């Protein structure tokens, strides 16, 4: 069972915390991680790109000049792709990029992502994270104490005070524990999470 240090908001060690082996010490499945991240990014795409083909642009019904005898290259329409204002060849059209991932695969990916953070010493567990009022300065001090440049800060539930304290810090993101996803975990260099949020993760994934 992996054991990690437990810190306060000042970055001082205040104890140890044992993590569930079935969540934070599994075999990292990079293939599944890749598939889930690709699916998440695909699902974020709007898919509303669109351009007109030569059949859709206006005009061009008349042949611009006769076929032979002008000395110029033959042309059939001023809306052919080689003309200015002509239609687009293989024009992109709105489409749905959504990909579905089985629940079992999402669970494997989440456990693999969490384990990778433990293996790479990028997991920081806080005893608690509470502020009386929004204080960006306090959050900057905490992030610097753990040498984080792009931290993902995970709290037990939505917290407006913490959110306002972090929103102006470049690279930092705050999410409630029930909104974490594999892509966010992997793209941030530090995974800062409260002890209570760890317990909630273990309840779901253990």
UniProtKB/Swiss-Prot annotation:
- Name the job this protein performs: One of the primary rRNA binding proteins, this protein initially binds near the 5'-end of the 23S rRNA. It is important during the early stages of 50S assembly. It makes multiple contacts with different domains of the 23S rRNA in the assembled 50S subunit and ribosome.
Look up keyword ATP-binding and say if it applies. Answer: no
Q: A GO biological process this protein is involved in?
A: translation
Record Pfam families: Ribosomal_L4
Query: Which chain positions lie within coiled-coil regions?
Result: none
Q: Where is this region: Disordered?
A: 45-76
Question: Which cellular component, as a GO term, is one annotated location?
Answer: ribonucleoprotein complex
Q: What keywords sit in the KW lines?
A: Ribonucleoprotein, Ribosomal protein, RNA-binding, rRNA-binding
Report the gene name: rplD
Establish whether keyword Ribosomal protein is in the entry: yes
Q: How does it assemble?
A: Part of the 50S ribosomal subunit.
- UniProt xrefs under InterPro entries: Ribosomal_uL4, Ribosomal_uL4-like, Ribosomal_uL4_dom_sf
Family stated for the protein in its record: Belongs to the universal ribosomal protein uL4 family.
Organism field = Clostridium novyi (strain NT)
Name by which UniProt lists this protein? Large ribosomal subunit protein uL4
Q: At the top level of its lineage, which domain of life is listed?
A: Bacteria
- Extract one GO molecular function annotation from the record: rRNA binding
Check the record and name the Gene3D superfamilies matching this protein. 3.40.1370.10
């Amino acid at each position: 069972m992996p054991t990690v240090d437990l810190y306060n908001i000042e970055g001082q060690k205040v104890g140890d915390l044992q993590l569930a082996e079935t969540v934070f010490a599994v075999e990292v499945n990079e293939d599944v991680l890749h598939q889930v991240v690709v699916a998440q990014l695909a699902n974020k795409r709007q898919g509303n790109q669109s351009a007109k083909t030569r059949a859709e642009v206006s005009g061009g019904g008349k042949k611009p000049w006769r076929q032979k005898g002008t000395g110029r290259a033959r042309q059939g329409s001023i809306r052919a792709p080689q003309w200015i204002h002509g239609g687009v060849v293989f024009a992109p059209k709105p489409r749905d990029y959504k990909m579905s991932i089985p629940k079992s695969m999402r669970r494997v990916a989440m456990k693999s992502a969490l384990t990778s953070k433990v293996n790479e010493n990028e997991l920081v567990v806080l005893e608690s994270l509470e502020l009386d009022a929004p204080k960006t300065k306090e959050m900057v001090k905490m992030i610097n104490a753990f040498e984080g440049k792009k931290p993902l800060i995970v709290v037990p539930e939505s917290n407006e005070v913490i959110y306002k304290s972090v929103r102006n810090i470049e690279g930092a993101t705050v999410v409630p524990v029930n909104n974490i996803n594999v892509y966010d975990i992997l793209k941030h260099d530090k995974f800062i999470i409260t002890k209570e949020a760890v317990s909630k993760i273990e309840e779901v994934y253990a």
